[in-house]
Regions:
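Cytosolic, membrane-interface loops and tails of multi-pass inner-membrane proteins
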Residues: 37-48, 146-155, 214-235, 332-360
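Polytopic transmembrane helical bundles with strong interfacial aromatic enrichment
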Residues: 1-160, 169, 187-189, 201, ...
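Intramembrane alpha-helical segments
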Residues: 237, 241-307
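Small-residue-rich segments of transmembrane alpha-helices in multi-pass membrane proteins
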Residues: 128, 173-177, 228-229, 291-308, ...
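Interfacial loop-to-transmembrane junctions
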Residues: 118, 236, 399-427
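Multi-pass membrane catalytic core of lipid/isoprenoid biosynthesis enzymes
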Residues: 224-265, 356-379
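Core segments of transmembrane alpha-helices
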Residues: 61-70, 169-173, 244-250, 293-301, ...
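Helix-coil boundary and interhelical linker segments in multi-pass alpha-helical membrane proteins
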Residues: 178-198, 250-265, 301-323, 375-387, ...
């Protein structure tokens, strides 16, 4: 395989790399001279000294580099949209570059706190590494513009939305916001709630898109998922992966910049848990995939709690445990209904490996344990009568459905259990919020 920078994409990449080298060198000089304090307005200023002028020139250079980055991103999504290395790598590089600019803006407006200085430096290093790797990769793999079929913009937007699994995102945001209200014992400020929920939505959507990239071949064999954008071939795998990576990176920096670092790293942990531990390692490897993998969906209330308190405590861990215990009976009920799909796709779900009778038994056992866990919050004195009454009522109905699943074979009662368990979790966390506010 011959290295060449003759393609237009490779040339753009090299030119962008050189511009970033100059930008970084200028930024280093500005940092050594502490020029930021002489150009404190953002994005432009009227410098009163040579050091302030140097800072202004650095920002203008960053603006020029930003245009180059946007052009590179556009070119990649036009000419390399089916390349599983170049398109994701370009998307990550450009996203990190703008994340660095975002952190740089926060540095100036927040008087250069140490944590943002460290984040700015580490992000700059990540941009350097990814751009260097992209330049070398473009020399080996880039090609000139290929004629792809025209795109239906409306269908395209619909497919991007589908990649994020919006229904799941909505449920996760309910538990995130409930964690905020329960942690603060009050209604959070609009700005904090907005940034936390936006960051959470992007994190959940990004991990959902990456999950669909990983499962694209599996999804083709399942009736429930065969029409997803990647499985159906309406989008290339590279596009799905790139979109997911971009959303995930943006989510981290939004959390870190506008919420706090603990919430940001918890959100990042949720992405890694879902993508790596569950999607890549557990889903096709063990019958315990749902049990262990359930921790990914249990992280959002921790993120919400950390957003308002800056810490974690026992009630937050109980919220995590509630969702962790809720996940197996919820998804095993679905697995009973979709057993043939999972069997065809080779996914070792409990009904496939141990049979429907054992699965129905485990649904009941885990439901009993789940309902018991929900009473831990009033037991430690953290919640009051509203939550306790709701936990009893909702839990009683859930136990009724679980008992019916245990006693009756077939899809009908399992589907009813699956549908109600979704509403159960939502209403339980809504009750938690009401209890915290009264």
């Amino acid at each position: 395989m011959k290295f060449s920078l003759s393609t237009s994409f490779a040339k753009r990449t090299l030119f962008t790399l050189l511009a970033v080298i100059l930008l970084t060198a200028g930024g280093r000089m500005v940092a050594l001279q502490a020029a930021g304090v002489d150009c404190a307005a953002w994005p432009l200023c009227l410098p009163g000294s040579l050091t302030g002028a140097a800072q202004l020139i650095h920002r203008l250079s960053a603006g020029f580099a930003s245009l180059l980055m946007l052009a590179l991103l556009f070119h990649a999504w036009r000419a390399q949209r089916d390349h599983r290395l170049l398109l994701p790598l370009t998307t990550v590089t450009v996203t990190l570059f703008f994340a660095q600019a975002f952190v740089g803006a926060l540095l100036v407006t927040r008087n250069f706190p140490l944590d943002l200085q460290v984040m700015h430096a580490l992000t700059a290093l990540a941009v350097w590494v990814s751009l260097a790797v992209l330049t070398v990769s473009a020399g080996f793999y880039a090609r000139d513009v290929v004629a792809f079929p025209p795109l239906d913009v409306r269908q395209r937007l619909k497919d991007f939305l589908t990649l994020t699994k919006p229904v799941i995102v909505g449920l996760l945001l309910v538990t995130t916001f409930a964690g905020m209200v329960a942690g603060a014992k009050a209604w959070p400020s609009f700005s904090l709630a907005f940034w936390t929920l936006l960051g959470g939505a992007l994190a959940a959507g990004g991990s959902g898109a990456i999950n669909q990239y990983i499962d694209r071949d599996l999804d083709k064999n399942m009736q429930r998922t065969a029409k997803r954008p990647l499985a159906a071939g309406r989008m290339t795998p590279a596009e799905g992966l790139s979109f997911g990576l971009g959303l995930s990176i943006v989510s981290f920096y939004i959390m870190a910049g506008y919420v706090n670092l603990l919430a940001a790293f918890l959100s990042l942990a949720g992405i890694i848990y879902y993508v790596v531990l569950y999607s890549m390692l557990l889903k096709k490897a063990t019958v315990q995939n749902i049990v262990i993998g359930g921790g990914a969906g249990a992280i959002p209330p921790l993120v919400g709690w950390a957003a308002v308190t800056g810490s974690l405590s026992l009630p937050a861990l109980i919220l995590f445990l509630i969702i962790f215990m809720w996940t197996p009976p919820h998804f095993w009920a679905l697995a009973i209904v979709r057993r043939k799909d999972y069997e065809k796709a080779g996914v070792p779900m409990l009904p496939v490996v141990r049979g429907e009778a054992e699965t129905r038994k485990q649904v009941l056992i885990y439901t009993v344990e789940l309902v018991a866990v929900t009473f831990l919050l009033p037991l430690i004195g953290y919640t009051g009568a509203v939550y306790l009454f709701s936990a009893i009522l909702l839990g009683g109905i859930l136990l009724y459905y679980a008992w019916r699943v245990y006693k009756n074979a077939g899809n009908k009662v399992a589907w009813m259990m699956y549908r109600y368990s979704s509403m159960y979790l939502m209403f339980l966390f809504l009750a938690l919020m009401v209890d915290a506010l009264v």
